[in-house]
Regions:
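Alpha-helical scaffold elements adjacent to nucleotide-binding pockets in ATP/GTP-utilizing enzyme cores
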Residues: 68-71, 94-102, 124-130
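Conserved S-adenosyl-L-methionine
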Residues: 106-117
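C-terminal target-recognition/interaction regions appended to catalytic cores
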Residues: 198-436
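Flexible, glycine-/basic-rich loop-and-beta segments that form/coincide
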Residues: 123-192
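Acidic carboxylate-rich catalytic motifs and surrounding loops in phosphoryl-/glycosyl-chemistry enzymes
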Residues: 84-87, 114-116
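Short glycine/serine/proline-enriched coil/turn segments at secondary-structure junctions
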Residues: 91, 118-121
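SAM-dependent methyltransferase catalytic-core segment centered on the flexible catalytic loop
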Residues: 2-83, 89-96
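Secondary-structure boundary elements
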Residues: 73-80, 104-107, 133-138
Length: 436
């Protein structure tokens, strides 16, 4: 409730007034809630009068910061509003209804890292923005100066708002139908960099301690959506996450990517050997071996030759209407052709696979990294890493191996992946998965 003196000044007296408020930046949700391992915080935001009166503002109004913002906007009309805050009220999908109401002219602002503030965890951008609420402009894109912790200007960055006119990447990937039996599983977390860490590919679905399905493995990967999911996966990981782009949104792309086979196949190879591709033969059949038994010098036949058939164009589409209105399948109908960069990744991976089967698969020997390591003829890259690196007492995979040859081969693979990522990155902006 506004004090009477303050209310009188605002309503009657033409004096300039500067008001300093330190609103609580408490959110109803947190990381555990996002991953479905926790619940919304009780009574953080849904017990206030502001919350009750502004249900039309969507999920954003759950946050006390947004409640302060909208109350100032409505009760002190025409004021100049300046604030330090996260960027979500400018670009997050949950704040689309909020931005339909909050109309103002952006005057000036800058971005700095969150870790320059006391008692703030994480590395993400904090924006200082000044708004003239007497001019009602729709927020479309805002340019900020970016400063580091030493007050050094790094660049100018544009923050784009999604206001229903520009969709995020989520409706794009979910329109591809998963027809047939599952080959693996993946997920679709919130479409910004901060949520990339939850994205992975696995051989089986994973469940949380409470029995609910983990979001990271809720979607089937089948022949009909494999290539789009690998593109989605690559798009989200190719561009390195930093504190500056932590809240940037991945978007529904233009259609130009559909005809770019090199881009599609580059993403296919990149996703196949990325560290977050955690397909393991221990969880089920490994359908994603891109090499023949002869190439790897092993005698035992693989359980699945799906990926080889897919790459050779031997998988037939079971339905033409894969893309809905586009009526186009992304199952190859002829052998996939790869760029030099992608071929280099495949060759580096092949050398690593050969070394694994040579060392771990030597019949008649008891070669092991530790007691929990076993030879898997159908091993995926994740299994190979586990074999050579082992796990610590907490069950986490060690970051290094004592095997120097393995380390050399793995580094070769990582380096070729980095070069491939550099080739993919410009296309991500060209096809508008991200905006510069």
């Amino acid at each position: 409730k506004l004090p009477e003196n303050l209310k009188r000044i605002i309503q009657n007296e033409p004096e300039k007034l500067v008001i300093f408020i330190n609103p609580p930046y408490v959110e109803a949700g947190n990381t555990k809630h996002v991953t479905r391992t926790g619940a919304n915080k009780i009574a953080v935001s849904n017990t206030s009068k502001v919350w009750a009166e502004n249900q039309n503002l969507g999920l954003g109004i759950r946050e006390t910061f947004a409640q302060f913002f909208i109350r100032i906007y409505k009760e002190i009309p025409g004021c100049v509003l300046a604030s330090f805050s996260k960027l979500k009220y400018i670009n997050a999908t949950a704040f689309v209804p909020f931005r339909r109401i909050f109309l103002a002219q952006f005057l000036k602002g800058f971005i700095c890292p969150s870790y320059t503030f006391d008692n703030v965890n994480g590395k993400f951008p904090i924006a200082f923005a000044i708004w003239n609420t007497s001019i009602q402009n729709k927020i479309k894109k805002i340019k900020f100066n970016v400063f580091d912790e030493n007050n050094k200007k790094l660049k100018t960055k544009t923050i784009y708002s999604t206001n229903g006119d520009k969709k995020t990447i989520t409706p794009w990937i979910t329109k591809f139908k998963a027809l047939g039996d599952a080959l693996a599983y993946s997920g679709n977390n919130a479409p910004d960099f901060q949520n990339n860490r939850f994205l992975k590919i696995a051989a089986s679905q994973h469940f949380l301690p409470n029995g609910s399905l983990n979001n990271a493995t809720k979607y089937k990967i089948t022949p009909t959506n494999l290539l789009p999911i690998f593109i989605y996966f690559s798009v989200r990981y190719v561009v390195k996450a930093t504190w500056i782009n932590d809240r940037d949104q991945f978007l529904f792309p233009n259609k130009n990517w559909e005809k770019d086979k090199e881009f599609q196949h580059n993403c296919f190879v990149y996703a196949l050997f990325h560290g977050q591709n955690k397909i393991s033969n221990k969880e089920g059949t490994n359908h994603f071996i891109p090499f023949t038994e002869k190439e790897l010098n092993i005698k035992e036949a693989f359980e699945s030759h799906f990926l080889l058939d897919f790459m050779a164009g031997k998988i037939k589409s079971t339905e033409k209407d894969i893309l809905g209105e586009n009526k186009e399948s992304f199952i190859p109908t002829k052998p996939m052709e790869f760029s030099i960069e992608a071929q280099n990744v495949l060759n580096a991976a092949k050398a690593l696979y050969i070394y694994y089967h040579q060392m771990a698969g030597d019949v008649g020997t008891a070669w092991k990294i530790n007691d929990k390591t076993e030879y898997l003829p159908n091993a995926a890259l994740y299994d190979i890493k586990e074999c050579f690196q082992g796990r610590n007492e907490k069950g986490r995979m060690n970051s290094k191996s004592e095997d120097l040859k393995y380390t050399e081969l793995l580094n070769d693979l990582k380096n070729t992946q980095k070069i491939l990522a550099q080739k993919i990155e410009p296309k991500i902006y060209e096809y508008e998965f991200l905006l510069e």
